[in-house]
């Protein structure tokens, strides 16, 4: 019986791309891992280094460096290429440079005959995901950004430290921009199935007055707190990429907050933003529409309006 070989390409072997590759190899997510970088020798070096660590894992992944032409048979192409924000910049400030890079990258990949799923981490990820969808001509379910997946993880971590509960027992999502304007759908955050708003109300003596906006800001600024201390972030986003890729290959039907192109969901059209979505082997099977409160709807719409204003600067 012929078995399909799972194949992933990573474009951009900087800290994010190499961290993603390391997660993929350690977890045995695919059988073939192609690395592509504008500095080909760097990609070769990363492939060699990763190949040398495989004997210490329970997996057997073929890792090699190549070019866009090799993307033809890939199931997933992960793009991490792009400039890192400089001190004082937001992710949105890198848009112009990132957009130019995507024109070259997507053109090269599509010329190979690629017909799989794009998975994006390049910032600003929501707008870049939209651009890649437009440039590639692929169906919207097969162009996915990491969106607020990492933000949602950071939110759960912050809440777990506050509540002294395992973060895996906390469910909730950051929505909107992967950036400063993101919001949290507090009406849908639960701890062991119990609404967090109810918990905070019932246990005021224990927790005191909790400023929810402060938690949202702490979540949104978490990346910058890391940046101030070590210069950049890569483990969290690298593992997020690997997690989404694994969910695709395993047809998990797992709900993950990703950058998705909306076409009527949440009353929004022609925009890519962070929302919970069901991830399957075909990419996004369905966008999960949370029943937001009036205040949450307003905050979500405001975040999307900010994204739209920046989209106009690159012609969308």
UniProtKB/Swiss-Prot annotation:
> What is the activity regulation comment for this entry?
Allosterically activated by fructose 1,6-bisphosphate (FBP).
Signal peptide annotation: none
What pathway is this protein a component of?
Answer: Fermentation; pyruvate fermentation to lactate; (S)-lactate from pyruvate: step 1/1
Q: Which SUPFAM superfamilies match?
A: LDH C-terminal domain-like (SSF56327), NAD(P)-binding Rossmann-fold domains (SSF51735)
Keyword Cytoplasm found: yes
An example Gene Ontology biological process: glycolytic process
The residues that hold substrate are: 91, 123-126, 151-154, 233
Record-linked CDD domains: HicDH_like (cd05291)
- The record lists beta-D-fructose 1,6-bisphosphate as bound by 156, 171
Write out the GO cellular component annotations: cytoplasm
Could you describe the subunit structure of this protein? Homotetramer.
What is the protein's known function?
Catalyzes the conversion of lactate to pyruvate.
The record's section on PANTHER family has: L-2-HYDROXYCARBOXYLATE DEHYDROGENASE (NAD(P)(+)) (PTHR43128), L-LACTATE DEHYDROGENASE (PTHR43128:SF16)
The protein depicted here goes by the name L-lactate dehydrogenase 3
The gene coding this protein:
ldh3
């Amino acid at each position: 019986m012929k078995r399909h070989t799972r194949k992933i390409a990573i474009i951009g072997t900087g800290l994010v791309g190499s961290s993603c590759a390391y997660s993929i190899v350690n977890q045995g997510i695919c059988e073939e891992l192609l690395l592509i970088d504008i500095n080909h020798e760097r990609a070769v070096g990363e492939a060699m280094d990763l190949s040398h660590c495989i004997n210490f894992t329970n997996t057997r992944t073929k890792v090699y460096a190549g070019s866009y032409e090799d993307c033809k048979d890939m199931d997933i192409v992960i793009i991490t290429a792009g400039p890192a924000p400089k001190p004082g910049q937001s992710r949105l400030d890198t848009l112009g440079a990132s957009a130019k890079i995507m024109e070259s990258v997507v053109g090269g990949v599509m010329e190979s005959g690629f017909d799989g799923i794009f998975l994006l981490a390049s910032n600003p990820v929501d707008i870049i995901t939209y651009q890649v969808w437009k440039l590639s001509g692929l169906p919207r379910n097969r162009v996915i950004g990491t969106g607020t997946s990492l933000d949602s993880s950071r939110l759960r971590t912050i809440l777990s430290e506050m509540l002294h509960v395992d973060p895996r027992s906390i469910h909730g999502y950051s929505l909107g921009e992967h950036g400063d304007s993101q919001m949290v759908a507090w009406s849908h955050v639960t701890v062991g199935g119990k609404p967090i708003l109810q918990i905070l109300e019932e246990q005021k003596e224990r927790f005191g007055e909790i400023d929810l906006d402060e938690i949202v800001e702490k979540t949104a600024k978490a990346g910058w707190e890391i940046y101030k201390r070590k210069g950049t972030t890569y483990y969290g986003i690298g593992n997020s990429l690997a997690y989404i890729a694994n969910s695709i290959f395993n047809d998990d039907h797992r709900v993950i907050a990703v950058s998705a192109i909306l076409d009527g969901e949440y009353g929004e059209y022609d925009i890519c933003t962070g929302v919970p979505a069901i991830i399957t082997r075909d990419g996004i099977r369905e966008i999960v529409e949370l029943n937001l409160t009036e205040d949450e709807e307003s905050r979500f719409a405001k975040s999307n309006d900010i994204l739209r204003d920046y989209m106009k600067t690159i012609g969308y």
